[in-house]
Each structure stands twice: as structure tokens, then as C-alpha cells.
Amino acid sequence: GLGDVYKRQLIMYKIIEVKQSVFEDNNKDANKLREECKDKGVFLLNVMSSPGAGKTTTLSRTLERLKDTMRIGIMEADIDSDVDAKTISEYGVRTIQLHTGGMCHLDADMTRQGLHEMGMEDLDLAVLENVGNLVCPAEFDTGSTKNVAILSVPEGDDKPLKYPLMFQVCDVVLINKMDVLPYFDFDVDKCKKNILYRNSNAKIFKVCAKTGEGIEDWCNWLENEVKALKE
């Protein structure tokens, strides 16, 4: 009857209200954190991708190249393991593990806690390796200076069309695993077109974390961005 319809509407309304206030509060926190990072000269990089796209390997390559030129700290977000944090800590950079307790993303407040725990005053570059997921992490602003999405060749060139928000919020997209291009039906030009359709300002780098292809261009870009923040 009508009562049921009303109840259903009420439930929907409540859910929307709660979600909206969560986003609004998070956006305020994120903007505050972005200001704090800028004031302290810390470049906060938020790295997102689906599981297995090569976040940790790409980060390892990036660290190899940049760890001697700047002070870097890494925050590894995982639902419940520390495998990635162990891998990264072998590079001798400050690494902390953030367990999200089952949540599929990090928000600005968790990121802030992680940064303070790491001692952000002593960092030039703080990298947040977000939870492997193409949906939730894109919805929550972490307060980052820049967002990076890693898209691997085996995932397909249509990912930017299927996950619009991820590619809309990203400043940079790394097309990773270029070494397996011959074995997959992946059109690089089409992929670039799809990315730019979602976000005409996105920077795109073709890389292979395994062989090191394209990593230098990506690292040069990042190094210049980190310097520019301090000017």
C-alpha cells in the first residue's frame, strides 16, 4: 500500500542524505589537507588502479629513479595485508601501511593521519598507493596534489568508457604493461582517445614497469611537478 511506498522513499532519502554528507565532509577535509601540503611543500600523489594493474611495480621503478633526488614517503592502503608495504620498504624509503578495515578506498582523514604518522614535514613527495579498485577510490578526494591512474594493457582499451569517474578525476594516466601489447587486442590510440574523451587535460604516458620502458619520461614529469609545488 501507500505506507510501504512512503517507507521505501524514506529509506532511499536517508541513504542519499548520509552519503551526501559523507562526501561533503570529506571534500572539506580534502581541501584543508591540500592547503596544508602546499604550505609544507609536500607533493601528495594518489595512485589508483584495479588490482594487478602494476601499482607496486611501477612505484618501485619510480623509487629507484627518484629516491636519491628527493625525500619520499609511501603510504600503502590495503584492506588487510602488508605485502606491498614490505616490497616498497626494501627501497629504504619511509613506508607505512594503512589498513582500511574492509573499506575499498581511502578518504582525506585517513590520508591525513597517515601523513602525520610518517612525519610529513621531512618529505618532498608523499605517495599514496590506494586500494586496488576502479570505482570507490575515484569517489573520495584524498586531498592529493595530483591523481594518477594506472591502466594495464590486459584490462582493455575501453576501461575509460566503463569507469568514467576514475579517468575524470585523474591528472595522469599510465598505460602499463606495454610489453604484452602484441598478445592483447588493445588499441593504444583508441585508449588515448577514450581517456581524453573523459578528461581532455589528462597527461598520458606509455610505460612498462617490468622492463622500465617509459619510466624516465614519467619520472621527469613527476620531478618537475614536485619542484614546481615548492616554488
Question: Where in the sequence are the language-model features?
Answer:
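Short beta->alpha connector loops at strand-helix junctions that form conserved
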Residues: Q97-T100, L151, N176
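Short, small-residue-biased leader/transition segments that mark boundaries at the very start
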Residues: G1-Y6
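Nucleotide-state-sensitive switch-loop elements of NTP-binding domains
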Residues: K14-E35, K40-M48, A53, T57, ...
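Cofactor-binding loop segments of dinucleotide-utilizing enzymes, especially the Rossmann-like FAD-
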Residues: A77, S152-V153, A209
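Short, glycine/polar-rich helix-capping loops at beta-to-alpha or helix-loop-helix junctions
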Residues: S81-A85, K159-Y163, D187-N194
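Canonical P-loop GTPase G-domain recognition
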Residues: L181-E231
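Conserved Switch II/interswitch segment of TRAFAC-class P-loop GTPases
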Residues: N133, G143-L161, D171, M178-D185
